[in-house]
Design a protein with these regions (language model features):
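Single conserved hydrophobic/aromatic residue that forms the stacking wall/gate
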Residues: 1-10, 14
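Non-catalytic C-terminal accessory modules of carbohydrate-active enzymes
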Residues: 28-36, 51-194
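Structured mid-domain segments that build the active-site/substrate or prosthetic-cofactor binding neighborhood
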Residues: 12-45
Length: 194
């Protein structure tokens, strides 16, 4: 997982080697995850390939596809994690809920975004689970995310606007939240390229 860390700008480094980086990311999600042997316990780490969703330090990895112009892949994987790693049940989380990170991942991603690098005021847009989410801010401001044509089938983003202006990259800043912006996301059932 350290190989895929972004804390010091790894995304920028890998932009120069985009195909190699995408290959590394893809291999993480497609590698064999079978558990074998007499002393093997059941998987509680939420494996998708070798991506362990129950291991909180890897939560940012899905959003790395946005940094290498594969936002549709981020959208697919966020959708897959919603459906395979979370349930309204006693055992509804993979891994464990230490420090609230499992829930934090779900809350932010279900609103349609995630902060890939803590402390960096940039958010990566993924796949919203809700048609509308509102964050109430001081002074009566609101940060609103509206997902149009959102459904289980429509997991891909067709277009995005922030305060009515088209977004050509799947990112926005913390200042956009604090300003009380509106992020509108048009969903579709087909992959789209930036």
């Amino acid at each position: 997982i350290r190989e895929r860390s972004v804390s010091r700008g790894l995304g920028d480094v890998y932009k120069r080697q985009e195909d190699a980086f995408v290959g590394k990311l893809d291999s993480l999600f497609t590698a064999d995850s079978s558990l074998e042997g007499e002393t093997t316990s059941s998987d509680i780490s939420g494996l998708i390939g070798q991506y362990a969703h129950g291991n909180e330090p890897s939560h940012h990895v899905i959003h790395m596809y946005n940094y290498v112009n594969r936002p549709w892949r981020t959208q697919e994987l966020v959708d897959s994690v919603y459906r395979s790693q979370y349930a309204n049940a006693v055992d509804g989380l993979s891994g464990n809920e230490d420090c609230g990170q499992m829930s934090a991942w779900y809350v932010l991603n279900s609103m349609g975004f995630y902060q890939v690098c803590p402390g960096k005021p940039v958010y990566s847009i993924g796949r919203p689970a809700f048609d509308k989410a509102v964050v109430n801010l001081p002074d009566g401001k609101k940060f609103t995310v509206i997902a149009k044509n959102n459904s289980k089938k429509n997991k891909y983003i067709k277009s995005m606007t922030l305060n009515g202006k088209p977004l050509d990259k799947p990112f926005f800043t913390h200042d956009d939240i604090i300003a009380g912006s509106t992020l509108e996301i048009e969903m579709t059932d087909r992959r789209t390229q930036p």
